[in-house]
Amino acid sequence: MSEITHEIDANFAGRLNILRAGVLGANDGIISIAGVVIGVASATNNIWIIFLSGLAAILAGAFSMAGGEYVSVSTQKDTEEAAVAREQLLLDKDMDAAKKSLYAAYLQNGECETSAQLLTNKAFLKNPLKALVEEKYGIEYEEFTNPWHAAASSFIAFVLGSLPPMLSIIIFPSEYRIPATVFIVAISLLVTGYTSAKLGKAPTKTAMIRNLCIGLLTMGVTYLFGQLFSI
């Protein structure tokens, strides 16, 4: 029963991490695109220039996020697969050394000598490779993250996050364009700050204020920069 509970907790934690990464990706989309469209709108009232600038920023940001996530997850997957291959080789060449290695890992992870010995014996009766990679490296055996899935998730999250600033800067009339966008972006940042804090079990108020301040600072700087080149 405890092993089943452990697997359920691990799967749940994995899903939470994916969801939290999605929220943070959306947050990047909000702040990045808000900064671009506010800066451009500060420099010109031409809606096509604003739209094309925002669209280019969305595409560049989304592909950059997706590419970075793909490289990161691919590297992690390669490392994990190498660890599995290394432990499989150890099992094939020297079973006693593999047992001692797992026993030492249990001790290092806080088990007493008796418990570590019992767990080691039990693991070698069931799935020693699974126990070795999970205890020694903290890897979820045969649960490698697909880099293409991770890249697609980052791409979608960034695009979804970019929608509030992009749509508001286009929809509202020119005289209300910037203040309305700032307001909508501020609300969006409060929501993502609250959500990410909840998922990470961190203080929500601090996260919301921090997120809002970063967004307002970004928009403020790009607005002033746009004023310097107003056309």
Model-found features: residue ranges?
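Internal alpha-helical transmembrane segments
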Residues: 1-72
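Residue-level signature of catalytic and energy-coupling elements of molecular machines
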Residues: 28, 67, 106, 116, ...
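Membrane-spanning helices that line or support transport/gating and their immediate boundary helices
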Residues: 62, 66-74, 78, 83, ...
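Interhelical loop and helix-boundary elements at the membrane-water interface
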Residues: 10-26, 88, 142-145, 199-209
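Core segments of transmembrane alpha-helices
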Residues: 29-34, 154-165
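Alpha-helical transmembrane segments of multi-pass membrane proteins, especially transporters
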Residues: 20-24, 49-57, 61, 123, ...
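Alpha-helical transmembrane anchor segments
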Residues: 19, 167, 171-231
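Cytosol/matrix-facing amphipathic helices and coiled-coil assembly/linker segments
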Residues: 2-14, 73-155
